[in-house]
Amino acid sequence: MSHLALQPGFDFQQAGKEVLEIEREGLAELDQYINQHFTLACEKMFNCTGKVVVMGMGKSGHIGRKMAATFASTGTSSFFVHPGEAAHGDLGMVTPQDVVIAISNSGESSEIAALIPVLKRLHVPLICITGRPESSMARAADVHLCVKVPKEACPLGLAPTSSTTATLVMGDALAVALLKARGFTAEDFALSHPGGALGRKLLLRVSDIMHTGDEIPHVNKHATLRDALLEITRKNLGMTVICDESMKIDGIFTDGDLRRMFDMGGDMRQLGIAEVMTPGGIRVRPGILAVDALNLMQSRHITSVLVADGDQLLGVLHMHDLLRAGVV
């Protein structure tokens, strides 16, 4: 490859905008291919009792991997198989209960062509995504999805650009259509993304991260203010609950309450905690989502809440617990 000096006045931005315009035109063409064949493909995938197995070589393989990942995270169980590996044993992962999606812009991938007779023998439904309706793969498919584009964004017409974008969008169209048909919810999505921010927000409950047992700072209503301050210091949550031996809640006292008392002045040494506590306290139930507890704390401008069943104290949740859990 020759390495020439940059042409004077070459406009990178204009070159980039030309790519966007060409690919936009390609996607506009895609609308006509969301037709009865698309419906048939969706029906086969929806009724599939096994997996949706995606195959593709080269750039089509990269798109296929993304497609399979999108299916899997949106309610359509799916995985990718490399056609070359499939020809050397990995085809054993495919069963008659599965549906195969084979991707090739030309529709003439020799690696996929070698697999089609075996898939037919196994009676595996075959959906082919190509840019050529007259190709051998399109003719062999049970359902053909066309992703033909006017031209590639590559000025040489060689590097897959517009065609791979169209294929990716067709995959997204399949995934989202199936998602809607299944009634797939944000909670369902979170179940397959437990390590992500969305998963934490939609799955993590107060009971998963609250302080319980000896971790709960608490004193009885006959304690002095000094006793309460020692308990706050020991448990390091910036507050203490005032409750009886059965953990029935009387109130709460926080370090914010203490600061406000200093602002008021006066002798605090002989005060009982019952004189200065906030009766009741703001409470949540253990089964609510941690993100809902966060929203409550932010709306009330507080850093901790009591976790309770009625007046019965079950735990304490602090803003720092939400930070550590990645909810904030």
From Swiss-Prot:
EC number from the UniProt entry: 5.3.1.13
Domain SIS: 41-184
Reactions this protein catalyses: D-arabinose 5-phosphate = D-ribulose 5-phosphate
Annotated positions binding substrate: 75-76, 82, 88, 114-123, 148-150, 275
Site (Catalytically relevant) location in chain: 59, 111, 152, 193
Enzyme class: isomerase
Chain residues that bind Zn(2+): 82
Limits of the CBS domain: 210-268, 277-328
CDD domains: CBS_pair_SIS_assoc, SIS_Kpsf
Pathway assigned in UniProt: Carbohydrate biosynthesis; 3-deoxy-D-manno-octulosonate biosynthesis; 3-deoxy-D-manno-octulosonate from D-ribulose 5-phosphate: step 1/3; Bacterial outer membrane biogenesis; lipopolysaccharide biosynthesis
GO terms of molecular function: arabinose-5-phosphate isomerase activity; carbohydrate derivative binding; metal ion binding
Keywords: Carbohydrate metabolism, CBS domain, Isomerase, Lipopolysaccharide biosynthesis, Metal-binding, Repeat, Zinc
GO biological process, one term: lipopolysaccharide biosynthetic process
Subunit structure and binding partners: Homotetramer.
Family per similarity comment: Belongs to the SIS family. GutQ/KpsF subfamily.
Task of the protein: Involved in the biosynthesis of 3-deoxy-D-manno-octulosonate (KDO), a unique 8-carbon sugar component of lipopolysaccharides (LPSs). Catalyzes the reversible aldol-ketol isomerization between D-ribulose 5-phosphate (Ru5P) and D-arabinose 5-phosphate (A5P).
The protein's name: Arabinose 5-phosphate isomerase KdsD
Organism lineage: Bacteria, Pseudomonadati, Pseudomonadota, Gammaproteobacteria, Enterobacterales
